A protein has these predicted regions:
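ATP-binding/phosphotransfer module of carbohydrate and carboxylate kinases, centering on a glycine-rich
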Residues: 2-78, 102-103, 122-128, 174-370
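Short beta->alpha junction loops/turns
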Residues: 86, 90, 165, 275, ...
Length: 370
């Protein structure tokens, strides 16, 4: 029999952080699952803005949340910190962040992980399964029932990745430019992008990007436009969407095989702005590819704030009850969460999470190795 987990102290407080590329969300949650404070701030990935600068942003948000809760705005801010961050892609990065947060005295225990784990926990009752987050970038992680973990470095093209909103926007622009100068086939992406930026032609768009009259981030805006043009039947746009679908299917299939889950009924969680914005037919094709590898797989598109998953992982870590986790989900709906697309038989839409075990166990991580 497994070791029985000690119940958390009634005054235990979890500091949950979801640090994405565009925003940072913080929740303070007590051992009963009640939300004590919540704050949102700018994206401040330590890998982008620097370690101390990023942690300064996180800490101010934690202080603000603590003040909302009527707690002292000085460390320690809580019992346990669960920080799940975009850019925490390698063990060395996670260890550096844990050491820095420990030095700041945020809480007696601290866990740092990639934000894809928070999405997996938000979209499942037990943190077991496979998650793909496709937002600005793309990442995939898997956790087996025995705690084994498979993940990819997710460092972009240098680590073999393809996908994410910026990549898709770049592809849309690339095809539009080539249609404009004659090097590529005709595509409705060309007039759509010109109209989007209110330009006289596609070359004005290129010049504005080159001279930074348009910020580089504007390329990300083309991602929804790409899907619109594809839905209207444009062959070029459909080809880009197919490449994304195939990439997601490959990431999920590889993870399922590495974790030997093909004979099981794994939950596949799809999240991030790109996934929650696509049409059902795109999800259907992804689902078809997933069930080819694991016939009993269930694919879910989850539009829940990943910080809720971070908080659930924090409650797992302190040994909180199933009731506490259900309470958190219920409290989050309509305030932190923004709903779920698709069928969710375990009741994640209304906050119910029946049968929620106490956690996913010790994680033996692998990078492309079984």
């Amino acid at each position: 029999m497994g070791q029985r987990m000690t119940a958390p102290a009634p005054d235990a407080v979890v500091i949950a952080i979801d640090g994405g590329g565009s925003k940072t969300d913080v929740l303070l949650v007590d051992a009963s699952g009640a939300i004590l404070g919540r704050t949102r701030g700018p994206g401040a990935s330590p890998q982008v803005v620097g370690l101390n600068e990023g942690l300064d942003v996180f800490e101010q948000l934690v202080v603000d949340a603590a003040k909302q809760a009527g707690l002292p705005g000085r460390p320690p801010y809580g019992t346990h910190t669960a920080a799940y961050l975009a850019g925490a892609d390698l063990p060395a990065e996670e260890e550096e962040l844990v050491a820095a947060l420990t030095e700041r005295g945020w809480s007696p225990s601290i866990v740092v992980g990639n934000d894809t784990f928070a999405m997996l926990r938000a979209g499942t009752t037990d943190g077991v399964g496979v998650a793909v987050v496709c937002g600005a970038g793309i990442n995939c992680v898997g956790v087996a029932a025995d705690g084994r973990v498979h993940r990819f470095p997710a460092l972009g093209k240098i680590s073999g990745d393809w996908g994410g909103g910026f990549q898709l926007g770049s592809e849309a622009l690339w095809w539009a430019v080539r249609a404009g100068d004659g090097r590529g086939p005709s595509t409705d992406l060309l007039p759509a992008i010109v109209a989007h930026f209110a330009a006289k032609d596609i070359f004005e768009v290129v010049e504005r990007l080159h001279f930074e009259n348009l910020p580089r981030e504007a390329i990300h805006e083309l991602c929804p436009l790409l899907f619109e043009v594809a839905r209207a039947g444009d062959v070029v746009a459909q080809g880009v969407v197919k490449q994304l679908v195939d990439e997601i299917g490959t990431m999920v299939g590889t993870t399922i095989r590495k974790l030997e889950m093909a004979g099981e009924a794994p939950t596949i969680v799809l999240g991030g702005g790109v996934m929650t914005g696509v049409s059902r037919d795109v999800i259907d094709v992804i689902e078809q590819q997933c069930v080819e590898v694991a016939p009993r797989a269930e694919v879910r598109v989850v539009d829940i704030a990943p910080v809720v998953g971070a908080a659930l992982l924090g409650l797992d870590a302190i040994g909180a009850s199933t009731t506490a986790k259900t309470r958190l989900r219920t409290s989050a709906v309509g305030s932190v969460a923004s709903g779920v697309v698709g069928q969710h038989p375990d009741g994640l839409v209304d906050g119910g999470a029946p049968g929620d075990p106490d956690g996913v166990g010790e994680r033996a991580e692998s990078f492309g190795a079984s």
